[in-house]
């Protein structure tokens, strides 16, 4: 690649980045177009992009020139000081005028021609520059103009005109009043000498400043808005207009209020969900329906051998329901009344039965006892064989017994205690 070029286009042609095509290439494009070549053929022959060929030919057919338009800073300035002053004058006369209306007035009044008329974007840029210059005015000038609009006089920091001046030693207070009157005449003359348009501009700026302040709602307005919010979180335009007419608020303010209120409601709903989840988490151990021994502490077994109380063996069942006890009772041993109760496998349906032994008939082989079960389990439990005992025996104490029973250590004395429980 040569040093004079900075790139190669998609057709293989060289070009200098940011600079227009040379005049020789432009002339060849026009000559080939006159000879009847299509733009796509010209693009392929001269290795120039199709867009570039179309742009040059379009400008040639429109203006008859093959010269490129001005680039960089070589473009003649159309926003001359005279044009800028006219634009500022039109804007002062009508602050709500549009840029295209200013452009039409410049043409109709002969300020500009079709050759040097600024574009709409140029006029908008001039208006932005004028607004920024006004905003960059000193604070003193801004406050002076605002006081002029409010009917006050004097410079910033001094007393308003309606306050009486303090008397200076050696000078009567009437001089101060005359001086204030003179200042009022000065300000009136300034405002009458071309400040009418500035007053309108300052009113517009003051209105914009006031629009940026937060809206203060009365209690009646808040109640009406909250009532409407309870009905729907997204009121339509008809509901907003009806509410605006009712509470004397702009419809846009009502729309913004509902947007802020919905955001507040979402925050509150999030907090409510968090509290609800925290309250739903179990803070205690769930009680099993089968009263397993892992929940309640079992009563410790007696240290005295069981053979000293009964001649039979301990109940050999491993069912969890039979070892079921309550920790609220005082420690008492559990005893069996059967000599040779046969070993039975645990039945799943017996897990809900209580381990209390109730006497059924004292005439059958001394005493015989059955386990107490719910009524719906009677048919199943009647088929279970129960062993009998030929000696004086004791029964298992149910968890519901709250009377402490003292069991003596000798077998002959036990008969005088157990009849009390029957």
UniProtKB/Swiss-Prot annotation:
Interacts with MAF and MAFB. Interacts with TRIM11; this interaction leads to ubiquitination and proteasomal degradation, as well as inhibition of transactivation, possibly in part by preventing PAX6 binding to consensus DNA sequences. Interacts with TLE6/GRG6. Pfam families: Homeodomain, PAX. Keywords: Developmental protein, Differentiation, DNA-binding, Homeobox, Nucleus, Paired box, Transcription, Transcription regulation, Ubl conjugation. The gene is Pax6. InterPro entries: HD, Homeobox_CS, Homeodomain-like_sf, PAIRED_DNA-bd_dom, Paired_dom, PAX_fam, WH-like_DNA-bd_sf. This is Paired box protein Pax-6. Residues 170-184, 281-294 have a biased composition (Low complexity). Residues 185-194 have a biased composition (Polar residues). One of its GO terms (molecular function) is chromatin binding. It is linked to Defects in Pax6 are the cause of a condition known as small eye (Sey) which results in the complete lack of eyes and nasal primordia. One of its GO terms (biological process) is cerebellum development. It is found in: Nucleus. Transcription factor with important functions in the development of the eye, nose, central nervous system and pancreas. Required for the differentiation of pancreatic islet alpha cells. Competes with PAX4 in binding to a common element in the glucagon, insulin and somatostatin promoters. Regulates specification of the ventral neuron subtypes by establishing the correct progenitor domains. Acts as a transcriptional repressor of NFATC1-mediated gene expression. The keyword Chloroplast does not apply. It comes from the Eukaryota. Belongs to the paired homeobox family. Residues 345-422 are annotated as: Required for suppression of NFATC1-mediated transcription. Residues 82-130 are annotated as: RED subdomain. It comes from Rattus norvegicus (Rat). Residues 157-201, 269-311 are annotated as: Disordered.
């Amino acid at each position: 690649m040569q040093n004079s070029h900075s790139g190669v286009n998609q057709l293989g042609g060289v070009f200098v980045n940011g600079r227009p095509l040379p005049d020789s290439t432009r002339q060849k494009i026009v000559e080939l177009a006159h000879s009847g070549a299509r733009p796509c053929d010209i693009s392929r022959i001269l290795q120039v992009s199709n867009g570039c060929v179309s742009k040059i030919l379009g400008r040639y057919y429109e203006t008859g020139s093959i010269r490129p338009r001005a680039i960089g800073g070589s473009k003649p300035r159309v926003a001359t000081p005279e044009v800028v002053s006219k634009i500022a004058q039109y804007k002062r006369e009508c602050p709500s005028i549009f840029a295209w209306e200013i452009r039409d007035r410049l043409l109709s009044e002969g300020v500009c021609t079709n050759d040097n008329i600024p574009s709409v974007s140029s006029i908008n840029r001039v208006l932005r520059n004028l607004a920024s210059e006004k905003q960059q005015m000193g604070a003193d000038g801004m406050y002076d103009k605002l006081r002029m609009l409010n009917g006050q006089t004097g410079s910033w920091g001094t007393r308003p005109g309606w306050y009486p001046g303090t008397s200076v030693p050696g000078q009567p207070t009437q001089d101060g009043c005359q001086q204030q009157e003179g200042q009022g005449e000065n300000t009136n003359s300034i405002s009458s000498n071309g400040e009418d348009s500035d007053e309108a501009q300052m009113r517009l700026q003051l209105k914009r400043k006031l629009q940026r302040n937060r809206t203060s709602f009365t209690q009646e307005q808040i109640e009406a808005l909250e009532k409407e919010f309870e009905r729907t979180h997204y009121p339509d335009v008809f509901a907003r207009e009806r509410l605006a007419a009712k509470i004397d608020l702009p419809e846009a303010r009502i729309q913004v209020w509902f947007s802020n209120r919905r955001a507040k409601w979402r925050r509150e709903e999030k907090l409510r969900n968090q509290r609800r989840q925290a309250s739903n988490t179990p803070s205690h151990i769930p009680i099993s329906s089968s009263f397993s021994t892992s929940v309640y502490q079992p009563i410790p077994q007696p240290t005295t051998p069981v053979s000293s109380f009964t001649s039979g063996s301990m109940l050999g069942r491993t069912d969890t329901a039979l070892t079921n006890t309550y920790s609220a009772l005082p420690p008492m041993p559990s005893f069996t009344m059967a000599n040779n109760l046969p070993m039975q496998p645990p039945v799943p349906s017996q897990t809900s039965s209580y381990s209390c032994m109730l006497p059924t008939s004292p005439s059958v082989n001394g005493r015989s006892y059955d386990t107490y079960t719910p009524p719906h389990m009677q048919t199943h439990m009647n088929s279970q064989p129960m062993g009998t005992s030929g000696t004086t025996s004791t029964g298992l104490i149910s968890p519901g017994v709250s009377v402490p029973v003292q069991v003596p250590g000798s077998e002959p004395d036990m008969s005088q205690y157990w009849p009390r429980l029957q």
